[in-house]
Design a protein with these regions (language model features):
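Generic recognition of flexible, low-complexity loop/linker segments
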Residues: 104-105, 153-155
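Short regulatory "switch" loops immediately downstream of catalytic or recognition motifs
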Residues: 45-48, 71, 145-151, 172
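Single conserved hydrophobic/aromatic residue that forms the stacking wall/gate
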Residues: 174-184
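Internal alpha/beta scaffold segment
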Residues: 129-154
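Acidic, low-complexity central loop/insert segments
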Residues: 24-134
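Histidine- and/or cysteine-centered catalytic micro-motif in compact active-site loops
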Residues: 120-122, 169-171, 182
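Anion-binding (especially nucleotide phosphate/pyrophosphate-binding) glycine-rich loop
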Residues: 1-30, 34, 38, 156-173
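ATP-binding N-lobe of GHMP and related small-molecule kinases
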Residues: 1-14, 88, 100-103, 107, ...
Length: 184
């Protein structure tokens, strides 16, 4: 994917800048890589006053207001981190019947956009480049079915009420020393 960022006036008076994210398929609710790059550019171009040791920039992005922090050394950005919009889980262990795939278990969560998180092993596929086309096809089918049957509900941002994508994970690769409620 190719990403771009259009800098605009902020929506909120408490923000320094507004950002619209673009990519080869359209627009996005957010992009962490772009936030990091923009923070460096904004600070080092002199668009904001450098505050040593950390300069804060508040951005309005489609998913809400975020704060980025540039650690400064010799008037240069040494590192960047940011606080994203609040994230939350809408559903854990939900099951949906997907044509040609059968029953698929997923978690539905928001972290700047709604994503369905699916353990790839239940589909008898490995996360390997050789199976990329099959994985993409399955992701599209799962996204379509969930979008048809499940309402994504953001508590106060109605324009975020849609499924942005499917994230495949391989839970067999996760090693948790202390069992949690989800992985017992």
């Amino acid at each position: 994917d190719m990403y771009g960022a259009l800098l605009v006036e902020p929506e909120k008076t408490t923000s320094d800048i507004g950002v619209i994210f673009m990519h080869n398929s359209g627009y996005s609710t957010g992009c962490g890589h772009a936030v990091i790059a923009l923070t460096k550019i904004i600070v080092e171009s002199g668009a904001v006053e450098i505050k040593d040791p950390v300069t804060e920039i508040v951005m309005d992005v489609p998913s809400g207001q975020i704060k980025s922090f540039a650690k400064i050394s010799n008037k240069k950005v040494e590192s960047v981190y940011f606080e994203n919009v609040p994230s939350f889980v809408q559903e854990l262990g939900a099951i949906i019947d997907v044509p040609s795939l059968g029953k698929v278990e997923y978690d539905l969560a928001f972290g700047g956009a709604f994503y369905a998180i699916v353990d790839i092993k239940q589909l008898n596929v490995n996360l390997e480049i050789a199976q990329l086309n099959q994985i993409i096809s399955m992701g599209k089918k799962i996204k379509k079915r969930i979008s048809e049957r499940v309402d994504c509900v953001h508590p106060f941002e109605n324009e975020m009420n849609f499924l942005y994508g499917v994230i495949f994970v391989d839970l067999s690769l996760i090693h948790i020393s202390e069992p949690t409620r989800r992985y017992r």
